[in-house]
A protein has these predicted regions:
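Cell-envelope/extracellular polymer assembly enzymes that use nucleotide-activated donors
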Residues: 4-7, 35, 176
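Short aromatic/hydrophobic "clamp" motif used to bind/position activated sugar donors
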Residues: 87
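Conserved donor NDP-sugar-binding/catalytic core segment of glycosyltransferases
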Residues: 99-130
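Conserved nucleotide-sugar donor-binding catalytic segment
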Residues: 136-221
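Boundary detector for helix-to-coil junctions that initiate low-complexity/charged tails
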Residues: 220, 224-281
Length: 281
């Protein structure tokens, strides 16, 4: 392996329309010691055609294909092909700032004991602005994820953690991976004070559309998988906390439902009419 060589992994499923933009953000990096692996996860669209055109732009770009297996499977497949010591996952509809890779590598050079390096982030697309995430602590990570997927880590640590869990096909696979990666004592995380990552907001972004029932199943699955660690960190109260949060989330979703709002208005009308009738009597 080349020294401080970075493998940028771009899984792609039916996102051909975004590939040029995301790869251009990789080509614009100030750090030159990288390879970019586009993983076609069985896309029925024209991902292959776009990717093959991108190969002509730079010989550091690679393209591989596989049968559809989901995001975790595609990331794992790409990382298996990677020759870099350092891995940076990057979803096909997102992009990175020109100095992001160099910032991560400088951090690893300064502190070889780091496990994960990430940065500040912003939204783009259908919504813009800063992506405000809570500060990382291991205990806070057990309650919710605050590290987006495009964070840099060592391939050797990915291997030790067992990769991304391919059973998690309904989102939140990043969260489970960070728990697997960081739960061992002594793991260090650094957040760079720079905007290096841009997360696209679109109508069907997975993060924005996880059904509460599927989210609950994800929580249950992760808690069971890492139960010893969960109990060691927080004990039983965390499970009650998770269930309470999901209950509130479901309740908010019901309250904001247009049918629920309509029924409330109808009820108010009936209540008003009933009050007026009582007064007439």
């Amino acid at each position: 392996m080349k020294n401080y060589f970075v493998s940028i992994i771009i899984p792609c499923y039916n996102q051909a329309q975004y590939l040029v933009e995301v790869v251009d953000s990789v080509l614009g990096q100030t750090y030159a010691n990288w390879e970019c692996i586009i993983v076609n996860d069985g896309s029925p669209d024209h991902t292959a055609e776009v990717a093959n055109e991108l190969l002509k732009k730079d010989d550091r770009i690679r393209y591989v294909e596989k049968e559809n297996g989901g995001l975790s499977s595609a990331r794992n497949f790409g990382i298996q092909q990677a020759t870099g010591q350092y891995i940076l996952p990057l979803d096909a509809d997102d992009k990175i700032a020109p100095d992001y890779v160099s910032g991560c590598i400088d951090a690893f050079k300064d502190d070889a004991g780091l496990t994960v390096v990430y940065c500040e982030a912003e939204f783009f697309g259908e919504m813009t602005g800063k992506w405000s995430l809570p500060a990382y602590t291991l205990q806070a990570l057990l309650l919710d994820n605050m590290i987006f997927c495009t964070a840099m880590f060592k391939k050797s640590d990915w291997e030790e953690a067992g990769g991304y869990d391919e059973h998690m096909k309904n989102g939140m696979e990043d969260w489970e991976f960070w728990i697997s990666l960081l739960k061992e004592k002594g793991r260090k995380v650094l957040k760079l004070p720079m905007v290096g990552f841009y997360y696209r907001i679109r109508g069907k972004s997975m993060v924005e559309n996880i059904d509460p029932s599927k989210k609950m199943k994800n929580y249950e699955y992760v808690c069971k998988k890492h139960i010893d660690f969960v109990m060691e960190q927080t004990g039983n109260p965390i499970l009650n906390y998770i269930e309470l949060n999901l209950y509130k989330e479901r309740l908010d979703k019901i309250k904001n439902n247009s049918l629920f709002v309509f029924c409330k208005k109808i009820k108010r009308i009936f209540d008003l009419n009933s009050t007026q009738d009582n007064r007439r009597r």
